[in-house]
Amino acid sequence: MKYPQLSLRETNAPYMEEMKTTAAEVIEGGWYIRGKYVSRLEEQLCAYLGCRYAVATGNGLDALRLMLRAYIEMGVMQPGDEVIVPSNTYVASVLAITDNGLVPVFVEPSIHTYNLDTSLVERAVTARTRAIMVVHLYGRVCWDECLKDVAARYGLKIVEDNAQAFGAVSPVAGLQGSFHTGALGNAAGLSFYPTKNLGALGDAGAVTTNDGELAEVVRALGNYGSAERYVNLYKGVNSRMDDLQAAFLSVKLKYLDEDNRRRVAVAKVYSEHIHGKEIVLPEPGGEGEHIWHQYVVRCSERDRLKSYLESEGVGTLIHYPIPPHKQQCYREYNRLPLPIAEQLADEVLSLPMSAYLNESDVLEIARIINRFDM
């Protein structure tokens, strides 16, 4: 493929020598789980986001699961309670809810931003609602005063799925004054899967929050339920980031803002040069509001467009072809009327996107798209 949707080798090439050096340091240090590199990364995440606590986890799904589980252990939620979640999110958001015995309440996204339509949230609130999960999909911030007002009025937690927007900045302050995704709500789950803007070289995640009790419970839950060795407060799990991944992430975090600026530049070239009348371009939002984890267009002939681009050497992906409520594992929700999520699943297509794409390649991809004949 001449223009792959993403090449992890090329993504990590600029940091390779520095990561090799730090890997050797970790190996020679002789301590690989919950060591000083994990502690350092947690401190760096707090400093970057402007939050008080960060707890490293084994992956992004575990971050979301442990965050919600901690609220249950704290008595804030109980099985059977409801969590509002966007209907077009990746299935991990919903798995985190149902794995804890909580009930997902699907709310449709905006067809324009792809994010949760916050104007629809209040009508989904019931006596059993305990939280709103906002997902900053594709790298665009999902946060506004409407969301904050609804949460305050009904006493709801706002939890963030910040798997795709690490580094994005909201134009509206969060609950504790930060403007960074991951520190807007009461707590957030982060993913450092290798394809993310800040990606490890394996699985890794984190929970970020200003709630000290929540952070303490999450840390114990991810360590077999133990805060003190051989003393188990909870029926926990093993979900701990290793020091090697933490060290890699510390290296890459130094370059994240510049990498995100490069992604913004790539998106700008796409938006200025794709002119196909049947191609709907994504909305960029305000400055810093979109860090372009994916550049997602819409097309009513999406599958034909995807095949055409593949024949021209342009790799694409679909994020996501089946919405959660249509998955076999959630067959009890298969008949829910969620037309916007289903339309997006039929139309969205992710173009090549990374910080290393050069302008000439992006221009050529745009020219290829413009030659597509409906």
Predicted regions and their residues:
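N-terminal "arm"/small-domain region of PLP-dependent enzymes with the aminotransferase-like
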Residues: 1-31, 312, 352
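PLP-dependent aminotransferase class I/II
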Residues: 9, 38-43, 48-54, 61, ...
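Phosphate-binding glycine-rich loop
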Residues: 31, 35-82, 95-100, 106-107
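Hydrophobic residues in well-ordered beta-strands that form the structural core
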Residues: 85, 106, 158-160, 209, ...
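Conserved coil-to-alpha-helix start sites within the AMP-binding
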Residues: 88-94
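Helix C-cap/helix->beta junction micro-motif
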Residues: 100, 153-154, 312
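Short beta-strand->loop structural element characteristic of the AMP-binding/adenylate-forming
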Residues: 102-113, 317
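Active-site phosphate-binding strand-loop segment of PLP-dependent enzymes
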Residues: 112-200, 206-208, 350
